[in-house]
């Protein structure tokens, strides 16, 4: 997976901190969405995941595409929450590789630093405690891949539209193996449901995919026909 020297520098809208700290300066921005008011007072916290941190499968950790926060609650002088982190499709500066798409789960702890100033800035006050990783698979349980889709045609399953796929030789990393054909995923956006399942937006399709809490694909929402890439009468 892609590794960053400084990863997951996070700016929190300070709605949580504002409940306990009175602000004397006007907010940077305010917006109302669906009847709920949100106020952004400035950078409230920052932290990082070590560049050499690895997940339970031995791959370096990235959460660069999207993040979702669940179970935000007060804890002492700070706050705790569960964070779902979505990596991109894997290292790809010289072409894509057969990286299995995944979602990382962290417990995060945020401790406000209301007295910090430009002259006396606070240190890192957002901690990431890695918990586990969910690998993403197709409806048949076969792992998905970060490889670019090819022109051999997509993969179809009962109740699903044809989805972009890649056929690769060997192990998909340039090494020996039996080869395979798998659904491709270039993960970009993430929304987590209350039951632990989650939606991911895919740039390859583009599709919207829903996965169960174990990472198995359960729903695929295909874009309108006018947006589908068609060549020779087939979706590519």
Where on the chain are the PLM-derived regions?
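Fungal secretory targeting signals
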Residues: 1-20
């Amino acid at each position: 997976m892609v590794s960053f020297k400084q990863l997951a520098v996070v700016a929190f809208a300070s709605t949580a901190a504002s409940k306990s700290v009175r602000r004397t300066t006007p907010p940077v921005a305010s917006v109302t969405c669906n009847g709920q008011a949100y106020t952004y007072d400035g950078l409230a916290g920052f932290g990082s995941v070590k560049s050499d941190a690895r997940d339970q499968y031995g791959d370096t950790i990235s959460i660069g595409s999207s993040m979702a926060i669940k179970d935000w609650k007060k804890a002492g002088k700070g706050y705790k929450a569960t964070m779902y982190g979505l990596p991109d499709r894997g290292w790809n500066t010289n072409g894509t590789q057969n990286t299995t798409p995944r979602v990382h789960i962290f417990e995060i702890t945020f401790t406000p630093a209301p007295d910090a100033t430009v002259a006396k800035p606070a240190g890192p006050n957002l901690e990431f405690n890695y918990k586990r990783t969910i690998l993403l698979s197709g409806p048949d349980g076969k792992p998905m891949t970060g490889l670019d889709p090819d022109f051999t045609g997509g993969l179809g399953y009962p109740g699903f539209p044809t989805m972009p796929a890649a056929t690769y030789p060997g192990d998909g990393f340039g090494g020996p193996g039996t080869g395979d054909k798998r659904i491709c995923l270039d993960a970009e956006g993430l929304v987590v449901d209350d039951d632990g399942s989650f939606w991911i937006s895919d740039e390859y399709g583009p599709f919207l995919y829903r996965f169960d809490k174990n990472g198995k694909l359960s729903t695929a929402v295909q874009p309108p026909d006018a947006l589908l890439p068609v060549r020779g009468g087939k979706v590519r």
